[in-house]
């Protein structure tokens, strides 16, 4: 049995086992430890949420000058993500298995390996999201602009092009009647329609490194910081069905260190650029006490002008995120530990 078949078997076995476990337990604990804040938010403190999702969130690079455009894509149509969520904390990882349709066309687009870790801490008002991701192997999506491609011909490939990055985002949800968790970790349920102003600060470091054996290769080290306002609103029907709309924009600074490796020595240059980002989100979902599901669509844009050149880097993309999750009873000791941490954070906020 090959690796893909073994992985499919493990995933299916886990899903079937969990669903069977849930069906046996039924609804016996649905009403336990239910906490409702002023009729707006229901806290699900006695259960752990486990979900699996598909998304097309991956790093691409698009550079456009007056007469040339380069669009580099990894050979990954969709990512598979697993998440565990409890109270204020969420942890997950994602990768790109070949058995998902659209992945694994290595003869045509080359081989890509990617992986991401992500964790989030979401309190009453404040939240922080941290992530680490890496990708190896890209292809030139617009190869036809540089050569004549016939059906079945491979794209121009960059198997030794590597990306890795760290990111942290911190924000504040101003409306206590709005549940940010209900849209992100699903550890709460929004019972009535509400919206909130959400400013966010973003910090990001990433590197793009061509590790091929060519005579001249390049590497960039990039640091980006930005800040901007946002707003989100959740329309709720029958306390379980919801439609969410959100808009976020940010203005920031991008510093790029470019190293060109040549046989007679490295050449290093630095650039400083202002960067503008915007993001719009639409979500539709079901958030019950035993399971939850939904689909989110994001439209995002990024633009900045390279220093001392006429080149403009821009990117406009559409993302999807389809998820399905269930809730299991949390161990008592986990609930006690989490309550201590949450109370400590609340005391520090109150003292400030």
Predicted segments, located by residue:
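Outer-envelope beta-barrel architecture signal
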Residues: 44-50, 78, 87-89, 124-128, ...
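Residues on the lipid-exposed face of transmembrane beta-strands in outer-membrane beta-barrel proteins
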Residues: 52, 80-86, 117-123, 168-174, ...
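Surface-exposed strand-loop-strand hairpins of Gram-negative outer-membrane beta-barrel proteins
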Residues: 57-79, 90-110
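Extracellular loop and loop/strand-boundary signature of outer-membrane beta-barrel proteins
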Residues: 66-70, 101-105, 151-159, 185, ...
């Amino acid at each position: 049995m090959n690796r893909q078949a073994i992985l499919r078997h493990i995933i299916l076995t886990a899903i079937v086992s969990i669903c069977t476990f849930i069906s046996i337990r039924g609804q016996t604990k649905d009403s336990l430890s239910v906490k409702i804040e002023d009729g707006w938010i229901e806290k699900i403190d006695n259960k752990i949420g486990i979900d699996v999702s598909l998304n097309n969130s991956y790093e691409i690079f698009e550079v456009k000058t007056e007469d040339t455009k380069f669009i580099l894509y990894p050979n990954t149509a969709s990512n598979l993500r697993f998440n565990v969520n409890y109270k204020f904390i969420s942890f997950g990882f994602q990768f790109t298995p070949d058995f998902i349709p659209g992945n694994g066309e290595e003869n045509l687009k080359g081989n890509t390996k990617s992986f991401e870790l992500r964790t989030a801490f979401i309190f009453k008002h404040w939240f922080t999201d941290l992530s680490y991701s890496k990708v190896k192997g890209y292809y030139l999506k617009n190869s036809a602009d540089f050569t004549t491609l016939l059906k079945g011909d491979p794209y121009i490939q960059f198997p030794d092009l590597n990306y890795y990055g760290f990111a942290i985002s911190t924000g504040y949800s101003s409306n206590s009647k709005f549940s940010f968790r209900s849209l992100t970790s699903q550890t709460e349920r929004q019972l009535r329609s509400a919206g909130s102003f959400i400013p966010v600060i973003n910090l990001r470091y990433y590197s793009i490194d061509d590790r091929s054996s060519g005579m001249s290769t390049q590497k960039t080290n990039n640091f980006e910081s930005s800040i901007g306002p946002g707003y989100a609103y959740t329309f709720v029907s029958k306390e379980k069905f919801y439609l969410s709309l959100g808009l976020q924009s940010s203005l920031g600074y991008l510093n790029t260190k470019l190293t060109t490796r040549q046989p007679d020595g490295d050449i290093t240059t630095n650039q400083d650029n202002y960067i503008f980002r915007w993001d719009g989100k639409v979500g539709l979902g079901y958030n019950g006490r035993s399971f939850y599901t939904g689909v989110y669509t994001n439209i995002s844009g990024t633009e900045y002008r390279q220093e001392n050149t006429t080149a403009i880097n821009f990117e406009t993309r559409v993302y999807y995120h389809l998820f399905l999750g269930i809730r299991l009873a949390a161990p008592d000791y986990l609930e006690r530990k989490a309550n201590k941490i949450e109370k400590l954070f609340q005391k520090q906020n109150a003292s400030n």
